[in-house]
Swiss-Prot record:
Signal peptide: none annotated. The lineage of its organism: Bacteria, Bacillati, Actinomycetota, Actinomycetes, Mycobacteriales. It comes from Mycobacterium tuberculosis (strain ATCC 25618 / H37Rv). Homodimer. Aminotransferase that catalyzes the conversion of histidinol phosphate and 2-oxoglutarate into L-glutamate and imidazole acetol phosphate. Shows lower activity with aromatic amino acids. This is Histidinol-phosphate aminotransferase. It catalyses: L-histidinol phosphate + 2-oxoglutarate = 3-(imidazol-4-yl)-2-oxopropyl phosphate + L-glutamate. Belongs to the class-II pyridoxal-phosphate-dependent aminotransferase family. Histidinol-phosphate aminotransferase subfamily. One of its GO terms (biological process) is L-histidine biosynthetic process. Pathway: Amino-acid biosynthesis; L-histidine biosynthesis; L-histidine from 5-phospho-alpha-D-ribose 1-diphosphate: step 7/9. Its EC number is 2.6.1.9. GO terms for molecular function: histidinol-phosphate transaminase activity; pyridoxal phosphate binding. It is an enzyme of class 2 (transferase). SUPFAM superfamilies: PLP-dependent transferases (SSF53383).
Length: 380
């Protein structure tokens, strides 16, 4: 569309003042031979899963003229069954809420427990959607730094929570982009001092060597919310399904802020089909962990500094110019992630042949390594 012969831009629109100058979130989506930038499970769904999804969606399509189950009860019951089996913690549909990806879950949580006059704290570098969603809900964003190895210094974190008294505390475990998990004793230290809601983001929980924070929900019912996704280990990124685990009162709060019929019939049917094949899908986790360790050892041997990871990716450096190094990988046909940390890049653990290509390129690029000043900042 044009105005007086000139294209209409954002400057011509009555955009909110706090959105001016901002850039949209999103990893590059490029057609390259090796894509290791968005932490997906590289193993495609099995034929049995694909057939089940097709059959389930076909059955759901019969009623596409009707709205879906607005509370997604059957899906939530299936998620509760999966989590009970995985964690050993007895959960019911009343403990689960589901939405279109964990980002929508996080947005709903901030709509309910954040907002104008309230604040949220995160320990950076961490998942960059936490501050973006905070900004979008007019929740004041507070940053506290991690240790030099990008791990969570629990004493520093506790002091920051005590000092700033945030309404929402974000704790990513494993953390993205550094990969470290937080132990249950350290989580308890933070939960003990959190004045409001603590959100433990377990997007990569299936890869973690630590027990899930789900085991603490009963002990901290008015404080703890655990968020998860089917986009990572579950190999369901295209299906867009996230969920949370909490006391039933938190689900009641979600009902106050969710949009009506937010989960389509198709999404619910496809996700339930995927859950029926969880054992087959998650059998790839052990192989991905083994590949992650192989990549870590190889990068270390090349002279890179590799942050020990408990997820399906590695953060590595130290580059004199990380953006330039990122471009060199891209020129080699390999897409990884510049997460905004000076001197560092992040690479998803791919299939063995993808990791081989990544390591061959890394061996060539390793000659550019020099020490850099570390500066933990917010990262995608």
């Amino acid at each position: 569309m044009t105005r007086s012969g000139h294209p209409v831009t954002l400057d011509d629109l009555p955009l909110r003042a706090d959105l001016r100058g901002k850039a949209p979130y999103g990893a590059p989506q490029l057609a390259v031979p090796v894509r290791l930038n968005t932490n997906e499970n590289p193993h495609p769904p099995t034929r049995a899963l694909v057939d089940d999804v097709v059959r389930s969606v076909r059955e759901a399509a019969i009623d596409l003229h009707r709205y879906p189950d607005r509370d997604a009860v059957a899906l939530r019951a299936d998620l509760a069954g999966y989590l009970t089996a995985q964690t050993g913690i007895q959960l019911g549909v009343e403990n689960i809420w589901a939405a279109n990806g964990s980002n929508e879950i996080l947005q709903q949580l901030l709509q309910a427990f954040g907002g104008p006059g309230r604040s949220a704290i995160g320990f950076v570098p961490s998942y960059s959607m936490h501050p973006i969603i905070s900004d979008g809900t007019h929740t004041e964003w507070i940053e506290a730094s991690r240790a030099n190895d990008f791990g969570l210094d629990v004493d520093v974190a506790v002091a920051a929570v005590v000092d700033r008294k945030p309404d929402v505390v974000f704790i990513a475990s494993p953390n993205n982009p550094s990969g470290q998990s937080v132990s249950l004793p350290d989580l308890c230290k933070l939960l003990d001092v959190a004045p409001g809601i603590a959100i433990v983001d377990e997007a990569y929980g299936e890869f973690s060597s630590q027990p899930s924070a789900v085991s603490l929900v009963e002990e901290y019912p008015s404080k703890l919310v655990v968020t998860r996704t089917m986009s990572k280990a579950f190999a369901f990124a295209g299906g867009r399904l996230g969920y949370l685990i909490a006391t039933p009162a938190v689900i009641d709060a979600m009902l106050l802020v969710r949009l009506p019929y937010h989960l389509s019939s198709v999404t619910q049917a496809a996700a339930r089909a995927a859950l029926r094949h969880s054992d087959d899908t998650l059998s790839s986790v052990a192989a991905l962990i083994a590949e992650r360790e192989r990549v870590t050892t190889s990068l270390n041997d090349m002279g890179f500094r590799v942050i020990p990871s408990d997820a399906n990716f590695v953060l590595f450096g130290e580059f004199a110019d990380a953006p330039a190094a990122w471009r060199r990988y891209l020129e080699a046909g390999i897409l990884i992630r510049d997460v905004g940390i000076p001197g560092y890049l992040r690479a998803t653990t791919g299939l063995a042949e993808e990791n081989d290509a990544f390591l061959r390129a890394s061996a060539r690029i390793a000659t550019d390594l020099v020490p850099v000043t570390r500066s933990p900042v917010g990262a995608p």
